[in-house]
Design a protein with these regions (language model features):
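Hydrophobic faces of well-ordered beta-strands that scaffold small-molecule active sites
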Residues: 37-41, 72-76, 99-105, 121-125
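Active-site beta-loop-alpha junctions enriched in small/polar residues
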Residues: 41-44, 79-81, 104-108, 128-130
Length: 146
């Protein structure tokens, strides 16, 4: 990352943000950790917009740009979705761009295994929930309780 100028913490030789983010009335009750890490989901979540579909080369270029921007972790995709997603995730994990490469998976053995097989640093797992599912869980718990 670029060096931060002490009298102007809102800019460095690589980036600029609003100086108002550093105003005393804004920061007085904020206790920032020493290190903040950014986990970017563009390659997966970015495609969940109507009309947006990244091809293999798009995903590689986006990941390279994210790495160049200093992103710490990239959620590269969901290998179980398609062969292309599996290849992108695996290829990015092998390229050692700098950021850790994560995969996304449902809490299903096959999903998680495919993510692990892709060689990622970590797996983000989703557990779907709804009032209906929570209700079913409670009912099943009640049926098994003596």
């Amino acid at each position: 990352m670029g060096e931060i100028m002490s009298n102007t913490p809102w800019k460095s030789d690589q980036w600029l943000t609003s100086q108002w983010n550093f105003a005393p009335e804004v920061t007085k009750e904020i206790n920032f950790p020493e290190k903040i890490q950014i986990h970017d989901v563009t390659l997966r979540d970015g495609e969940q917009q109507t009309g947006v579909a990244f091809n293999y080369d798009d995903k590689i270029r986006i990941a390279e740009a994210l790495a160049e921007a200093g992103i710490h972790r990239i959620e590269a995709g969901m290998p179980v979705v398609s062969h292309q997603d599996a290849k992108v995730v695996s290829d990015l994990a092998k390229r050692n761009l700098g950021p850790e490469i994560f995969s996304f998976a449902r809490c299903m053995v096959d999903d998680v295994q495919r993510a692990v097989d892709a060689g990622v640093s970590g797996v983000v797992m989703e557990v779907p929930s709804s009032q209906h599912l929570i209700g079913l869980t409670q009912i099943s718990l009640n049926l098994t309780t003596p």
